[in-house]
Amino acid sequence: MAARSKWLPILAVCCLLALGGCVALSGPPADSAYNWTTVTAVDSDTNEELATVDVRIADNGSLRYTGLSNTTSLGENEGMLFIHNSEGRYGYVMRNMAFAIDIVFINADGEITTIHHAEPDDDATFRGTGKYVLEVPYEYTTDNRIEEDDRIEIPEQYR
């Protein structure tokens, strides 16, 4: 009996160390966890193509939570498309962000409802209504004349 009680604390410490290692290894999703697609911004009045963006798809809770937090920058026509299960009012934050972005809320029909030009700020919440949220480089929407009421064409497989 004494031998058993001698090993119990050692076994407990080993279990805690193993559990701690599992938690440390289950950090944010790797870039390879994301699928990629291309979306197109279209002028609502003229149907002119304004820009195309290669986006990572964030379509589950873990990917949406992490977002661009572990990204150091975005390329010129690069972004992230967040896909929610249903249209609603959502709030986005700049958790652990090192650079500014535009946050574009898009309804289920692809119409832009709100555009925020967001500076890194852990305390700010950027709100809008939509089923999709597109994050692109800062002032990308201004530089490409993308405005509220314009459309974002999203491939059918992500609609």
Name each region found by the language model.
Residues 1-159:
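Hydrophobic alpha-helical segments
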